[in-house]
């Protein structure tokens, strides 16, 4: 599954305004809940519970908070870019500027794992990360992903 099949430019939050980990998770979850008409509190609780089990900061300035929740009808993705680094307890100890929030219903476990892997594979490449960090608009961010996935 391609990320661009789950994402549209209106699902890219730019700029992320929260300055701490819990605030970023809440901000992105609010965007997801508003976009799909989900129960914000239920989805936020699921994401926070997953994050409490271990940080989803994967290094290189990237975090992939994720959860499964009956509060969402289908696998959903919201991305965000912060103008300044946010402390996130990442595995490399570095703060984060690039966020990918994935939430899906319990039955979407297989797709969920594939999307996690797809994101990790794409952001491992420094040129892709740099272009995502430098994207000036949600459309530009989306087009960077589109281009990266076409390769």
Stretches with model-predicted labels:
Residues 1-151:
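Cytosolic covalent-transfer regions centered on His/Cys nucleophiles
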């Amino acid at each position: 599954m391609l990320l661009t099949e789950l994402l549209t430019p209106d699902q890219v939050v730019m700029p992320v305004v929260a300055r701490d980990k819990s605030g970023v998770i809440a901000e992105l979850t609010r965007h997801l809940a508003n976009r799909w008409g989900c129960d914000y509190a239920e989805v936020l609780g699921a994401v926070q519970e997953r994050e409490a089990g271990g940080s989803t900061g994967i290094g290189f300035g990237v975090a992939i908070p994720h959860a499964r929740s009956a509060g969402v009808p289908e696998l959903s993705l919201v991305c965000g870019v912060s103008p300044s680094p946010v402390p996130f307890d990442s595995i490399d100890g570095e703060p984060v500027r690039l966020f990918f929030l994935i939430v899906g219903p319990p039955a979407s476990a297989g797709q969920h794992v594939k999307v996690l892997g797809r994101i990790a594979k794409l952001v491992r490449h420094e040129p892709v990360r740099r272009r995502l960090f430098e994207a000036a608009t949600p459309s530009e961010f989306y087009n960077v992903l589109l281009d990266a996935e076409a390769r």
